[in-house]
């Protein structure tokens, strides 16, 4: 399965939302949930969509679990040595995809899909996640909301980094 990640797409928001609504199982418009607000586009097995972008980052799937649906998408970028990538793939749970960068190096991404922030928080506190994290070299995480409406990208939307009501 071919996966592409487009960082900070240059197309208008309306065009990105249309691409997503036309192919909801393949295109995910992602809005970062942090002060470093920005958007990315995750494209799964839709080369016709990838062709519309100048700088997609290509990946090949190594493990696929469940379905790609949810309001919260958690991304982990990491490197792996030896056969740690295979061990990490065996620990995947829920709705997730693990992919290796097309450049042939030991650079990987995991995208996991969650209905709520509470579900993601439970996973991040789990023993399985701790085991996965211990096998990763230089892990870097980003959490996104699944953007379905232009209003989610408004500058008037409250940043949630320090919102105790949001994070609990």
Spans of model-derived segments:
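A common structural junction motif
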Residues: 129-134
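Helical (often loop-to-helix) elements that flank the catalytic cores of nucleotide-handling enzymes
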Residues: 125
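Short, surface-exposed coil-to-beta transition loops
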Residues: 105-109
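Short hydrophobic/aromatic beta-strand micro-patches
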Residues: 79, 111-113
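Short S/T/G/P-rich N-terminal loop/turn motif that feeds into the first structured element of a domain
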Residues: 1-97, 101-104, 121-122, 139-168
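Short loop-to-helix capping motifs
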Residues: 115-117
